[in-house]
Amino acid sequence: MSQVILDLQIASEQAQGLPEEKDFQRWLEGVLPQFQEVSEVTIRIVDEAESRDLNNTYRGKDKPTNVLSFPFEAPPEVELPLLGDLIICRQVVEREAVEQEKTVEEHWAHMVVHGSLHLLGYDHIEDSEAEEMEALETEIMQSMGYADPYLAEKDGLTE
């Protein structure tokens, strides 16, 4: 049986209204077991200031972002289930949910799925990579009972 170990850190001033730990656990379990037997992920919920600082430091972009993924890179001889860390900005997720006409829950789920796929090595820099990753995200989201997360984009509602 596969196992997903979650370390949830709330570093947001406003913890009220956030998804519960069981929600984050369920979303991770919707993604990770199909890729590896045991996975360990840290999810840190932050405010815009920390998101902006990390995004600027690691990506050279001086603005907050929805999710940052930091894969754990162990030496080849070390086998650990630790995949890495997801840093998710509460305010950006909530704002984007409104802009994309999604429920906040759907967008939180999507950010966990999206970030987890980055931890597993998926990317969306090239168009072909983006198509593969978005198709996988859509499949995973739908398997958990959510709509296609890119529906608004496909309908021309967002960029």
Curated annotation (Swiss-Prot):
Enzyme type, top EC level: hydrolase
InterPro entries: MetalPrtase_cat_dom_sf_prd, YbeY, YbeY_CS
EC number: 3.1.-.-
Localization annotation: Cytoplasm
Record Gene3D superfamilies: Metalloproteases ('zincins'), catalytic domain
Signal listed as a keyword: no
Cofactor binding, per record: Binds 1 zinc ion.
The organism's place on the tree of life at top rank: Bacteria
GO biological process: rRNA processing
A Pfam short name: YbeY
Similarity-based family: Belongs to the endoribonuclease YbeY family.
Role this protein plays: Single strand-specific metallo-endoribonuclease involved in late-stage 70S ribosome quality control and in maturation of the 3' terminus of the 16S rRNA.
Name recorded for this polypeptide: Endoribonuclease YbeY
Organism field: Pectobacterium atrosepticum (strain SCRI 1043 / ATCC BAA-672) (Erwinia carotovora subsp. atroseptica)
Lineage of origin: Bacteria, Pseudomonadati, Pseudomonadota, Gammaproteobacteria, Enterobacterales
